[in-house]
């Protein structure tokens, strides 16, 4: 998996427009900031544990990339066709944890991509690949870009990139 594919994968797996749409109206910047920090910590943990996890279940990095692409594709199809329901959220800054960090931003596709990406490129490249997605999420939230059409566009882009991640895994086998 190239670093470019990992960056694009993280952007579409997180889907900044979907995250901006889920941000609480009261204080979206603070919630997105908390969520971004939480997601970064979770990505580092998933990346650091990638090799032991994959070894424990007997899965290769290429197979993990295929699984990541399939998980990303499921989220992308959901974003493309289903309007997100408002998630119940914790009060104040805690809304950045639930629902923003989990389950909106650190969805199964992001978790699998973090594991697959770190096994292939290392944790440092994984973290560097996650930062653009978090910056775009903050920009989308501050600009109020969480509209249904943009969420669907993010889903369409996600389906394309997810397919590329699956193909990357298949070609690596």
Task: List each model region and its residues.
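Structural signal for alpha-helical transmembrane segments and their flanking helix-loop junctions
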Residues: 1-29, 90-140
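Juxtamembrane boundary at the C-terminal end of a transmembrane helix
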Residues: 163-173
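Transmembrane alpha-helical segments of multi-pass membrane transport proteins and ion-pumping complexes
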Residues: 10-18, 43-51, 74-84, 108, ...
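Alpha-helical multi-pass membrane helix bundles of inner-membrane/thylakoid proteins
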Residues: 63-71, 75-106
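Interfacial loop-to-transmembrane junctions
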Residues: 141-159
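Interfacial helix-loop-helix linkers and transmembrane-helix boundary segments
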Residues: 26-33, 52-61, 83-93, 118-121, ...
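Membrane helix-loop-helix hairpins that form the core translocation module of multi-pass transporters
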Residues: 32-81
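Select subsegments of transmembrane alpha-helices in polytopic membrane proteins
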Residues: 35-41, 95-106, 154-158
